[in-house]
Amino acid sequence: MQAELVIKNGLVILETGEVITDVAVQGGKIVAIGQDLSGERVIDATGLVVSPGMVDAHVHITDPGGGYRDEWEGYVTGTAACAKGGVTTFMEMPLNQIPATVDKTSLEIKYKAGENKLKVDVGSFGGVVPTNLADGIQELDEGGVSGYKCFLGTCGDRSIEGDFQNVDDYSLYEGMKQVAKTGKVLAIHAENAPITDKLGAVAYQNGETTLAAYVATRPVFTEVEAIQKAILFAKETGCRIHICHVACQEGVEEVLKAQAEGVDVTCETCTHYLYFTTDELDAIGPVVKCSPPIRDADQQAALWNHVQTGGIAFVTSDHSPCTPDLKDTTNAFEAWGGISGVQNNVDVLFDEAVQKRGLSLKQFADMIAANPADRYHLAQKGRISIGKDADFVLIKPNAPYILKAEDLEYRNKISPYIGREIGAQVIQTILRGETIYAQETGVTEAFNGVFIKN
């Protein structure tokens, strides 16, 4: 019997390691792995690495924009960038869309905004904020979110009704108790708000303008203290937690220490922390501003070590786009803090991790797909194995190219990777057996993606 699709002769990353073999797909699922399989459609992957499609566990899509952020990043452009970049599934953050996703009503608004606009599959985070502790967390659970998100650092615009808010200590404690009852994971932006806010205000008042000065207002200890607090509260409440975008080795070490004590905690870092360092930020400009900030070369080397040894569970983009005017300033303190990166996870990470640092292909696939899928219970995602969704990214190794602005599918062609030579290329992306991007034909016109509801 012929399968609907067979991917032939690729170097396929399996649970047991990589092997040159064929993969057969029927009804959007992987149905066979082996030699000499036959299919109605055949993709010749000779010379290519066949990886599970990336599961990017940290992406912001600003849809709906609520009249405030309508030009930031919608589902159409954001998911097109995912397709071109080899991301077949992402976890969408509950901000910066208006309204923020914090209860049944706002979750339904978000689902409605994405109807017939998704080129990839999307899991959802619900927010934990001071205003949704009555019943919002339970409503989000019933509405199918795959996890929750809160901010310890300051976030949101208080002048915009319905924008996201960071938690105070009581809201964190009470929110964790409620999330614990759902059994789902609370992802945490861990920075000390009072100290970073004050240091930033003082630096701005003193006339500081550089990105180096901005980094100095968010010192390592402000990240570590917030991680320690989150872990302490997790011990008290039994809440499963995940620390987002860790930018320092000391933060990872706190997570590892807590794991050894039996706490259900994991952490991620982001592609940009593994690629850029503080000393080059001002030459690049505000396009590379984010929080926590990009730290020095020693911190980057330590993060890479934790990636290689598994202390960092997975790597994300923290794709946080905005309009060009919010980056067009000579004062780093006035610029929007967020990096557009979802289109250049797979190629940059393959080059930096596998080709330059010798990470195994199995480790690569775990880092971009299996581990995030497991953490957020995306049961059909993350692995090339029989019965899983047929989600693949085909990668051409040792194929350098220079990224140009016109290559980007984002609504706003902003990225710190523009002009950089990237040493691998995404050749094709497949979602549940359907090609959603091919290098020779571009991104599909179809909207085959769905919201995953847990």
From Swiss-Prot:
Source organism, top-level taxon: Bacteria
Amino-acid positions noted as binding Zn(2+) 1 in the UniProt annotation, renumbered to this chain: H58, H60, K149, D318
GO cellular component, one term: cytoplasm
Keyword check for Chloroplast: no
Keyword Lipid biosynthesis belongs to the record: no
PTM annotation (N6-carboxylysine): residues: K149
Cofactor note: Binds 2 Zn(2+) ions per subunit.
Co-factor(s): Zn(2+)
Stored InterPro entries: Allantoinase, Allantoinase_bact, Amidohydro-rel, DHOase/Allantoinase_Hydrolase, Metal-dep_hydrolase_composite, Metal_Hydrolase
EC category: hydrolase
Record EC number: 3.5.2.5
HAMAP family for the chain: Hydantoinase
Known function: Catalyzes the conversion of allantoin (5-ureidohydantoin) to allantoic acid by hydrolytic cleavage of the five-member hydantoin ring.
Protein name: Allantoinase
